[in-house]
């Protein structure tokens, strides 16, 4: 290695002794490597030993010990090369006196970095000299031609490697290289093979003389000088792996398979593959191909990849804002500039690989890296990125992900379409505000609100100051636009639509509600015409669960408003958009954007009179509720965007709340009912009245109850509410009143069973409150938000009555259920139709105690209630603890379902029966009558179909696939051959005809059932095993049967009792 000490370095030792120690110390890399035990060498460079820099750190001591191990082997060629250099030195020094200091600094920097330790430890060298300077001025005559002088222009691989290193050193000063390869996916190679490639710690050994070297460069130099290699790299190499034998350790081909090795050990210029690193090095030496591999400025450093996520977070937050538009989009935005990006795009090899250069054998990672740059590429602007995180950050910061969502939409991801060019104003604000959000969004995938909240509150404070400072419309518009942008950034993590999205007009030509509606319609059609392939099939019909509710809840989608896209609508900032959270009517009150605040004040005045009366009534539940509410600190809202938007619209009032988590919650509660003229009060009352109440009434009253039965959007709404709402129940933090209402009405009795009125009122008050603090974007979106213009006719006049309703209803209505629904409706003048529908629904619900639970898991609890009330009044005995496979089914419900299923069978021309799905209406009727949720019915049907397809039979139907089906009656065990006979047989058990199911109201059916006492008596005459003297009653469910056989069958099938126990559960009744 002493051979590396070039003439200039020695000259410097003598001529510029004063410079050298400073340099050395500054470099922090003592020139330990230049010292060798040989005396002649010591004499040759005395100043290296005497200089202060010669004190060794433990690390360098270590590396020197490595050197001394092998120095004896190297002595032969070291001494000769030293003599050569000493000869040339005499010639060179006089020529070079003028330039010696320049090249000296360069060479020292290079050598220190390149040779001093295997870790390439962090150098804080301020070297910005271009590599060309180094090539011209620095002669390293370590190659076999010792006569090369500084100006000779002999450009060998060693110079090139140094040039490369010089480049890297200048820009990648901070790189901790040891973990370099953790980011390059060469995981297949065992670290034993080339330990130092991966760790930098062990040795490269020469195959011939076993000399060990710290770097691949040194090994290659050694091979070059001593001739310890065979130049077998011919064209045939690829096809002829059998050459002179290599130790097994050195042969990647043998270890890992030919393909892997060839992919990795490949000359980047000519594409030849090699068996070992040595062969590759030799090839590079001989062909000079290393000079032809493109080597431009290195791109963004590895640091971005290497720093752990914990450290990445702060750096992102600090640095992203400074250059949000940098095409590199990497966290270290300052280091990547546009030229890097251009080079990256123009040349596949200008990729992160350059930062490794030839160090540590990293050259064979180039191929992978080159490909990676093609993969991690922004589809919009084409910039390449080193890691997925960087690409994500780039997309977030520049908003490019929005522009490529078309394809995503086609693949079915629910992403908002947005206009391609955001307006200037929006962009300006994005730069300031949305960037940190993007960072937080992408760095903290955890949904813990805490991680995001501080950032948001800061944002909000910024916004407050801004808005207070400038109240005229322009800045406000900008703010709102940027708020939208922020909102989008946050929610982009989820890719969910929000109500806000629905309110915006379809600039991009995409009407969300329309497309949603089409999707749902096609889904429903699929569900009706056969089992579709998608997994949501069984639950889609939950949509049709509450007919009246459907009629009220959501307008015909035809009328749905066009939606404004997310970005770039700062020109159109109309109240509708301003109060996206707030929802329709609030915006209707203030048609002119600039009169937002005045409109609010007027509205507040109107509302205060009405609400003041109710204030006292509400205060009690409110105060009860506020502590729990406060428990969810407001920053949670950062997890979704509404509060931010809300905050934009409602000016300073709302912001104070955001910034002081607990008290504002209270304020919100007291303020909204009492509408205190505090600004808080103003803002909140408005949204309250607007969004939660008249919004819905506007929609409800707008279309008549005669509307077609199943509106796709209402279907979707209901499904979302049932499933999302249900799922999110644990994390109560946020549902809006609309979706809450849907959810409640869908599982009303279930709640009624467990909840006493106070909790329900509490819950109700909570939604009113939660309306402003949506904490989870995961809550069901309220599709009605999109219909803002439908209720335009409802002016502020409508709002004031409306706004009183929540308070009044919750205080006056005692039943939990009614309060829930009525609170959702409002006392608005136009509400009669809606309310009458709701009252009908409530009547049905309360009288039958039906529970509309949406999950199959609650079927048992549900049908115990259902069965009890629907079948006979006296059936509600403690039959709740049934066991067995069908314990959760009320037998009567099964009969209805089986009959309906049989009715849906269609006979083909060949005489076989095919299954067709029940129409939503039929399911609806069953659901209304039995109280089973649509989901449950759909699951049952899907299960039956699955069994029939798979095995050709199910419990009540066998041999369907043969064309000669046999139907089994659950009650009396009769076997029937045709669907029509089976249906009439089941109808005789039920006591009514299936086609009457839709016409009969629940009361009529209940009465009918009560009159017929036991439907099975009706079919006694037709029962083959009838015993005229007695009927048999099941003690568990009080049903009566015509024969012992039937009751035993019933006990085993329905209650899972074994035949031995039958006598315990059967009582004989005399016929009356």
Swiss-Prot record:
Q: Name the domain of life.
A: Eukaryota
Q: Give the sites modified to Phosphoserine.
A: 672
In this chain, the C2H2-type zinc fingers fall at 204-228, 265-289, 376-400, 967-989, 1032-1055
Q: Name one GO cellular component term.
A: nucleus
Q: In which tissues is it expressed?
A: Expressed in cortical neurons.
Which InterPro entries does this chain map to? Answer: HD, Teashirt_fam, Znf_C2H2_type
Q: Where in the cell is it found?
A: Nucleus; Cell projection, Growth cone
Q: Pfam families from the xrefs?
A: zf-C2H2_6 (PF13912)
Q: Region (Disordered): which ranges?
A: 44-71, 130-153, 228-247, 315-336, 469-489, 569-594, 616-690, 784-815, 846-888
Gene3D superfamilies named in the record: Classic Zinc Finger
Listed A to Z, the keywords are: Cell projection, Developmental protein, DNA-binding, Homeobox, Metal-binding, Nucleus, Phosphoprotein, Repeat, Repressor, Transcription, Transcription regulation, Zinc, Zinc-finger
List where Low complexity composition bias occurs.
791-815, 847-860
The protein, known as: Teashirt homolog 3
Q: Where is this chain primarily localised?
A: nucleus
Start-end of Polar residues biased regions: 571-593, 649-660
Lineage per the UniProt record: Eukaryota, Metazoa, Chordata, Craniata, Vertebrata
User: Which Gene Ontology MF annotations are present?
Assistant: chromatin binding; DNA binding; DNA-binding transcription factor activity, RNA polymerase II-specific; zinc ion binding
Q: Does the keyword Repeat apply?
A: yes
Q: What does this protein do?
A: Transcriptional regulator involved in developmental processes. Functions in association with APBB1, SET and HDAC factors as a transcriptional repressor, that inhibits the expression of CASP4. TSHZ3-mediated transcription repression involves the recruitment of histone deacetylases HDAC1 and HDAC2. Associates with chromatin in a region surrounding the CASP4 transcriptional start site(s). Regulates the development of neurons involved in both respiratory rhythm and airflow control.
GO biological process entries:
in utero embryonic development; kidney morphogenesis; kidney smooth muscle cell differentiation; long-term synaptic potentiation; lung development; metanephros development; musculoskeletal movement; negative regulation of DNA-templated transcription
Give the similarity note. Belongs to the teashirt C2H2-type zinc-finger protein family.
Q: Which organism is it from?
A: Rattus norvegicus (Rat)
